[in-house]
């Protein structure tokens, strides 16, 4: 073998270690992406959110570094690096703008969840409940099981009475708030079990948070401007 060449055994060993390292990283990433849901594991969900939040500044930093390294060396790479940096920065700014607009409507830190741009909100036993949803659904179902209230499958409260089911729920987006009015329910008061169904009734520039200080009827609590 000529001088300066790398032994084949050493190359194979490096490839084996590199492959093993990436195998661990990708396996962890697969578990986090598949089970990183708030209903399954709060810890994995937190890790998943941290990864998503880190990606924006990391990609922006890599794009700027590539632009610096390619300057006066490869103008094509330099142009693409600047383009990717601009796209990443624009997406990052749009995320914060929409998240802040959504927070103004809901006053919930779920507004900064990068997975969704819609939050379902309602008031249960005097407590505001806010849940991230993938989008504004056609209808919303609240389920009551022996006094335990489930909103879109999320357990949000216990000891709830049938009479305490809300008359409306809202789904807030960055640009609008959709009000869902209750159109039907089927409940068993003795066992505290049943369901209530809500459909869209109106939308507009409303706050999704009920105003506890105002003297308003249940049907008027939501429609006050942000």
UniProtKB/Swiss-Prot annotation:
Intravirion side: 33-41, 97-226
Residues in the Virion surface compartment per record: 1-11, 63-75
GO CC terms, sorted: host cell Golgi membrane; membrane; viral envelope; virion membrane
Region (Interaction with N protein) location: 200-216
Keywords on record: Glycoprotein, Host Golgi apparatus, Host membrane, Membrane, Transmembrane, Transmembrane helix, Viral envelope protein, Viral matrix protein, Virion
Membrane topology summary: Multi-pass membrane protein
Cellular localization per UniProt: Virion membrane; Host Golgi apparatus membrane
Record Pfam families: CoV_M
Database matches in InterPro entries: ALPHA_CORONA_M, M_CoV
Cited PROSITE patterns: COV_M (PS51927)
GO molecular function: structural constituent of virion
Annotated transmembrane regions: 12-32, 42-62, 76-96
Main location group: virion
Subunit annotation: Homomultimer. Interacts with envelope E protein in the budding compartment of the host cell, which is located between endoplasmic reticulum and the Golgi complex. Forms a complex with HE and S proteins. Interacts with nucleocapsid N protein. This interaction probably participates in RNA packaging into the virus.
Function, as annotated: Component of the viral envelope that plays a central role in virus morphogenesis and assembly via its interactions with other viral proteins.
Family (UniProt): Belongs to the alphacoronaviruses M protein family.
HAMAP family per record: ALPHA_CORONA_M
Name of the molecule in the record: Membrane protein
């Amino acid at each position: 073998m000529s001088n300066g060449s790398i032994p084949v055994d050493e190359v194979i060993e490096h490839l084996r270690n590199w492959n093993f390292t990436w195998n661990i990283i990708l396996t962890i990433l697969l578990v986090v992406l598949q089970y990183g849901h708030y209903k399954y594991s709060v810890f994995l969900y937190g890790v998943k959110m941290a990864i998503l939040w880190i990606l924006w500044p990391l990609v922006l930093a890599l794009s700027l570094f590539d632009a610096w390294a390619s300057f006066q060396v490869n103008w094509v790479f330099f142009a693409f690096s600047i383009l990717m940096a601009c796209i990443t920065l624009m997406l990052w700014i749009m995320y914060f703008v929409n998240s802040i607009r959504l927070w103004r409507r809901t006053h919930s830190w779920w507004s900064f969840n990068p997975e969704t741009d819609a939050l379902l909100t309602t008031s249960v036993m005097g407590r505001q409940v806010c849940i991230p949803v993938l989008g504004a659904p056609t209808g919303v179902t609240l389920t009551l099981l022996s006094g335990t209230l489930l909103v879109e499958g999320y357990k949000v409260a216990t000891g709830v009475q049938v009479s305490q089911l809300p008359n409306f729920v809202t789904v807030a987006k960055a640009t609008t708030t959709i009000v869902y009015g209750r159109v039907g329910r089927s409940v068993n008061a003795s066992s505290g079990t049943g369901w209530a169904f809500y459909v869209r009734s109106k939308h507009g520039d409303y706050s999704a948070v009920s105003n506890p200080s105002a003297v308003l009827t249940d049907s008027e609590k939501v429609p006050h401007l942000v």
